[in-house]
Curated annotation (Swiss-Prot):
Protein name per UniProt: Plant intracellular Ras-group-related LRR protein 8
Pfam families: LRR_1, LRR_8
LRR-type repeats, residues: 56-79, 80-102, 104-126, 127-149, 151-173, 174-197, 199-219, 221-244, 245-268, 270-290
UniProt keyword list: Leucine-rich repeat, Repeat
Organism: Arabidopsis thaliana
Alphabetical list of PROSITE patterns matching this protein: LRR (PS51450)
Position of sequence motif GVYW: 291-298
Gene3D superfamilies named among the record's database cross-references: Ribonuclease Inhibitor
GO cellular component terms given for this protein: mitochondrion
Expression sites (tissue/organ): Widely expressed except flowers.
Family: Belongs to the SHOC2 family.
Task performed by this protein: Leucine-rich repeat protein that likely mediates protein interactions, possibly in the context of signal transduction.
GO terms (BP aspect): mRNA cis splicing, via spliceosome
Length: 383
């Protein structure tokens, strides 16, 4: 299992990959950095005329990083042939709509460390885009059209001024494996984030988050969750944090959390849990300082005691889900599919959408759907 440092290192190769990556024949031009003389890129009105032969070549990788560019004019380039574009570390204030709309084969775009306040709506035309880095700009929002970049695997929007993310981002970007939005002004994450079922890393530290989505258990591949340093804004964690079956690292340090959810005792794969800098009451400091295993045992025992004391109607949500996931077992309880209906949306609450039964709020990944026969959700048409 990869640790956060390893995964972070893996991600850092994206920028380097844009310069020297050679795979499946995508790069068929010499790997040398483009200069003002080899590309007609205009910087503050100063332009250099390229040779006619250079104008007609089909460039696959275009690196214009660190050239102090303030604007772009790439009329001499066959933009449709570009697969990787690096415009990082410049002074670019605006990306032309027409420029982006022409780069239909682009799969890696690096715009970090510029002066961007907005991204063009035409970014939604980049249907093959897999890596997008817009960190270190002045973005206050991401265009809704980014939801059309359905091939996107990594989105880095760190160090901006984002106050919100597109509402449906989680419903559309189903291939996203890393979402990094640290050092922004986010007050909340949209509920749709809970349906990024391919997500492995979620980094939302250094924001102003006051809460997290309730249905985090849908993130079955999530390995790293970092919501540290939201300070006094984040005071509670949802119970579903303890239902993240693949979670390896959880960092909730330096927040205003007083009580950790008992469900943390069910995190079987957890290897690193950071809770320092919180005014914790439960678990007490004496338990926390004993380390991860002691904390997990304490939370697990506390959850069991709470379950025994709680009236039946109030037990169903948490324990019902834990049993379904195989994270908990109780005497006299079956873990089979026929085991009651506690903790799940009633079938009557579902409606047909293109032949698939979904709840009214479009739950794309409900545990009941996973563990029930397909026939329960794929019904023959009614006439």
């Amino acid at each position: 299992m990869m640790g956060y440092e390893q995964m972070n290192q893996m991600t850092m190769t994206t920028t380097a990959m844009m310069k020297n990556y050679n795979k499946k024949g995508l790069i068929n031009t010499p790997q040398k950095k483009m200069t003002r003389r080899s590309v007609s890129a205009i910087d503050g009105g100063a332009a250099a005329t390229a040779k006619e032969g250079d104008r007609r070549q089909n460039i696959k990788t275009l690196d214009l990083s660190g050239m102090s560019l303030a604007s772009l004019s790439a009329s001499s380039i066959n933009l449709a042939s570009i697969s990787k574009l690096d415009l990082s570390n410049n002074n670019i204030q605006k990306i032309p709509e027409s420029l982006v709309a022409r780069m239909l084969n682009l799969w890696a775009l690096d715009l970090q460390s510029n002066q961007l306040k907005t991204l063009p709506n035409s970014i939604g035309c980049l249907s093959k885009l897999k890596f997008l880095n817009v960190s270190g700009n002045y973005l206050q929002s991401l265009p809704k059209t980014i939801e059309d970049c359905r091939s996107l695997e990594e989105l880095n929007a760190n160090f901006n001024e984002l106050t919100r993310l597109p509402d449906a981002i989680g419903f559309e970007l189903t291939n996203l494996t890393k979402l990094s939005v640290n050092s922004n002004k986010l007050v909340l994450l949209p509920n749709s984030v809970s349906y990024l079922t391919s997500l492995r890393v979620l980094d939302a530290r250094l924001n102003r988050l006051s809460s997290l989505p309730e249905d985090l258990e849908n993130l079955v591949n999530l390995q790293v969750l970092n919501v540290s340093q939201n300070f006094q804004h984040l005071t509670t964690l949802p119970y579903s944090v303890g239902l993240l079956i693949s979670l390896v690292e959880l960092d909730v340090s330096y927040n205003g959390i007083t009580v950790l959810p008992d469900s943390l005792g069910c995190l079987r794969r957890i290897q690193k849990l950071s809770v320092e800098g919180n005014p914790l009451i439960s678990p007490p400091f004496e338990v926390v300082e004993q380390g991860l295993e002691a904390l997990k045992q304490y939370m697990s025992e506390k959850m069991t005691e709470s379950y025994k004391k709680t009236p039946t109607k109030k037990k169903s949500w948490g324990i019902g889900k834990l049993v379904k996931y195989g994270l908990s077992s109780s005497p006299g309880r079956s873990t089979g599919r026929e085991d009651g209906k506690e903790g799940f949306i009633n079938v009557s609450d579902y409606r047909q959408i293109d032949g698939i039964a979904s709840p009214r709020h479009v739950s794309l990944f409900n545990p009941r759907r996973l563990l029930s026969p397909l026939s329960a959700y794929f019904s023959p048409p009614r006439y």
